[in-house]
Amino acid sequence: MKEFSVIIEKDEDGYFVASVPTLRGCHTQAKSLDTLMKRIKEAIELCLEVEKPTSNEFIGVQKVAVNA
C-alpha cells in the first residue's frame, strides 16, 4: 500500500477540491468531504495506471503574507 499527500481546498461554489502534488493531473471535486475522499482514492488508482509518481517529496503547505 502506498500513501499520497492530498491538498484539499474549498472553491467559491462550495465544492471541495482535492489534488495530489506528486501525481500530475490527479484531482477531483465533490460537495462533501466523504465523497471527495472516495473520489480522490479512485483518481489516484486511475492516475497510477498511466503514470508513475514523481520523485519529489511533498513537504507541506505554508502561508505567505504579501501586500496586495
Model region roles, listed by residue range:
Residues M1-S5, D11-D13, K38-A68:
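Short, charged, surface-exposed hinge/linker loops at domain edges
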